Amino acid sequence: MNTLLKNQEYLIFLAGVMVSSGIIKSNNYFAPIFSWLLDKVKSKKLVVYFVSFVSGVLPVSGRVSVSAGILDTLTPKDNCKSRSKFGIIDYLATHHYYLWSPLEKTIIIPMAVLSLTYLQVMSYLWPLLLVTLFYTICYIKVMVNEEDIEINKQINIEKTKTSFVLFPLLASIGFLIAGYNGNLIFAVLSVYYVIFSKDFKFWRHINWSLMALLFLVTCAANYISTYDKVFEDYIKNQNNIWLACVFGFLFSFLLGSSGKFIGIAVLLTKIFGMKYFALFFALEYSGYLISPSHKCTCIGKMYFGTPILDYAKVLLLWIILIIITAVSVIKI
């Protein structure tokens, strides 16, 4: 039972993000900021590029939830088709981080286990990062229209009030980056926004269906993780590289964890050699991206109403491009 309940504290963090972003959106507190950005760049798409870039590189746990909350303030309330596109943007904008951040275990573990410097790791992974960034930019460019983005320039909100909303959020993100408890930070932030806005029916901002779904997904992921040792032993005994590729992908798909997928990739690299590192990383990363145990697709589906089929089409093309790129850079 304790195993199944592991990591469920994430739900407290998510509820805090939902309440905070819901109050900001319903009161249009960020309208002056987005309006100012729009005046400067003259394009709603460029505002989305900027917001998704900033929220996507936050070195914090639960980045996809924070990013979703911020992007939600740019989406129309009632246009389901427009809103659904932001679930994809949220996903793409927050998952290139695993390919480059020196603060992320997907970079730290290869550096430690394979005795590589950061630049050496990036010498293997930069083609995958380049493809991912290009794909993200193209998705926003091609799939998102100006009409899909809601920036209301007519709303007149005092700059002082906007400051009292923005600075506590920035401070909270700063505390997250510094390593403080995210559950406590966003619980306090949501209480502050409730009092500031006098929106005491805060529970209406919480997506209870999403909370229930994430609870079940986390339970399933925790149960599967009890078989980690079985998967690891099986992989160690693989002598055929192509079978190792298949099983590595499948196990990463089942486990749905960034720590697990990079562990498998590094283990296979130790067995078969450094020239296959980018390939193993790409395969295990791809398995992780589409894993049913991966909470991020659930967040986008329930937060923005993004259909699973839309995720499937976008992610399938992305992982095909990543794997093809990885195969093409293998040094024979």
Question: What do the predicted segments below correspond to?
Answer:
Residues 84, 102, 106, 121-134, ...:
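C-terminal transmembrane helix pair
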